[in-house]
A protein has these predicted regions:
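Alpha-helical support elements that line or immediately flank enzyme active sites
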Residues: 124-135, 180-188
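N-terminal glycine-/lysine-enriched basic segments
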Residues: 130, 156, 161-169, 175-176, ...
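Generic N-terminal targeting/processing segments that precede catalytic cores or assembly contacts
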Residues: 1-109, 132-133, 242, 249-289
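Glycine- and small hydrophobic-enriched segments that form the cores of compact globular domains
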Residues: 86, 113-120, 132, 143, ...
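Acidic-glycine-rich active-site phosphate/pyrophosphate-binding loop
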Residues: 88-105, 140-159, 203-212, 271
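Glycine/serine-rich anion-binding loops at beta->alpha junctions
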Residues: 103-128, 169-176
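Carbohydrate-binding/catalytic loop surfaces
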Residues: 165-176, 219-229
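Functionally critical mobile loop/hinge segments
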Residues: 181, 185-289
């Protein structure tokens, strides 16, 4: 029950008539030489941590170590409660939880790297929002997380999820691709539609640079988690509507990796280019020299 690329994954789904989530769950059991109970228990713990990281800052904001972020999630939550939001219930909740998770991370709280700390808000942001709005069970969300895991595995095996190697497109891009695929399955989409959604995300985030102010995982990282979760939602919606992609996921992962390696070092997590060089941002950073 192993696979090296999306094409092989889709073949397994077709042959066994199983969703991506279950193929990935069974792979974890077999490759990890562990038990069904152990794998399920671990994913339940993952969801528990994700919830705490996403919900806590909404109630009790904490300033980040670098002083660049803190309180944004609570502002979004209050704006949603006021009835003046323009994004719609799912997206407003999703960006709130995505930004909240980055606040937790930046204040030394416990998060789940999804796939990295700098992109940790996108997957839980979208899935927790869908759970609240559509009343999905924790078990449903755990299954969706296995789906997200499959997409992350493909990116890590065949490309990268490191900003230092491939820019922010490899971090928030892959995170959003994972979220889009997971959301597509959660909402009843097919395995092929899941890969279309993931491919759509990578295409739309292609070339995004990694330029953290002060070298900290705060700004613009938090903002990009919000925009990443929005792109993931759009991609899932398109895929569920039956819109296909000309470029399959395997090719898009390769393209992302190729583009990332062509980015100059200044735009790959070194804090020597992009937003990291903005005087206004540097003046606000407690950690900047």
């Amino acid at each position: 029950m192993d696979f090296k690329n999306a094409k092989e994954l889709l073949t397994l789904c077709q042959d066994h008539q199983l969703p991506i989530s279950e193929i990935m769950r069974q792979r974890e059991i077999i490759v990890g030489e562990t038990t069904d109970e152990s794998v399920n228990s671990r994913m339940a713990r993952v969801l528990e941590i994700m919830k705490d990281a996403a919900f806590s800052p909404v109630k009790t904001p904490v300033k980040s170590m670098g002083g660049l972020i803190g309180g944004e999630a609570q502002k979004l939550s209050r704006h949603l409660a006021s009835g003046k939001g323009i994004c719609g219930n799912v997206l407003e909740k999703a960006i709130t939880y995505a930004m909240a998770t980055l606040e937790t991370n930046a204040s030394m709280g416990l998060i789940v790297a999804s796939p990295t700390a700098g992109s940790a808000g996108i997957v839980p942001g979208l899935l927790l929002a869908l759970q609240e709005v559509y009343d999905f069970s924790d078990e449903d969300i755990q299954k969706a997380l296995f789906n997200a895991g499959a997409i992350g595995y493909l990116a890590m095996r065949n490309a990268t999820v490191a900003g230092a190697v491939g820019g922010c497109q490899a971090e928030t891009g892959v995170a959003a691709a994972r979220a889009a695929s997971a959301a597509t399955e959660l909402m009843g989409g097919t395995p092929l539609q899941c890969t279309y959604a993931a491919s759509t995300v990578l295409m739309n985030m292609l070339g995004l640079v990694c330029d953290p102010v002060g070298g900290l995982v705060e700004y613009p990282c938090q903002n990009r988690n919000a925009s990443g979760v929005a792109i993931a939602l759009v991609a899932a919606e398109m895929s569920l509507a039956g819109i296909t992609q000309l470029i399959p996921l395997d090719e898009m992962i390769t393209i992302m990796f190729t583009v990332g390696k062509k980015l100059p070092a200044e735009l790959r997590e070194t804090a020597l280019g992009g937003c990291a060089t903005a005087p206004s941002a540097c003046e606000s950073c407690h950690m900047c020299g």
